[in-house]
Amino acid sequence: MDQFTAMMIAEGSYSADEDEQITAWQTLINTGLAWQLQGWFGRTAQALIEDGVCKSANELSA
């Protein structure tokens, strides 16, 4: 998924099912964009990682 689409899904501007939402957030985490956008992106990404919904970029590269 490209970064723009991921951001639009995360913001709720594009409709998406649960799997697409998880993929969008994982894309934002993998690219680091989650930490560069508004604060709630990073906070939400961190919560998804802590809840086991998404993996940290470090976990994926290990």
Question: What spans do the regions from the language model cover?
Answer:
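Catalytic phosphate/metal-binding cores of nucleic-acid and nucleotide-processing enzymes, i.e., regions
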Residues: 1-62
